């Protein structure tokens, strides 16, 4: 079953994006490079708790 997760900017710590993830197939935390509107640049976004 897919669960909703929140992606947090690693620089300004704003919660910008939500996405889904299959926890059975991917156990590790998700990390993506996405655009942060608050920083106004592409930054690393990590899955929050």
Curated annotation (Swiss-Prot):
Matching InterPro entries: Ribosomal_bL33, Ribosomal_bL33_sf, Ribosomal_zn-bd
Claim: Ribonucleoprotein is one of the keywords in the record: yes
Keyword Signal: no
Molecular-function GO terms, alphabetical: structural constituent of ribosome
Domain of life: Bacteria
Keywords in alphabetical order: Ribonucleoprotein, Ribosomal protein
NCBIfam families: PRK00504.1, PRK00595.1, rpmG_bact
Record's protein name: Large ribosomal subunit protein bL33A
Organism from which the protein derives: Acholeplasma laidlawii (strain PG-8A)
């Amino acid at each position: 079953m897919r669960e909703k997760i929140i992606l947090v900017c690693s620089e300004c710590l704003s919660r910008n994006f939500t996405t889904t993830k299959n926890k059975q197939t991917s156990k590790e935390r998700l990390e993506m490079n996405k655009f942060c509107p608050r920083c106004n640049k592409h930054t690393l976004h990590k899955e929050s708790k």
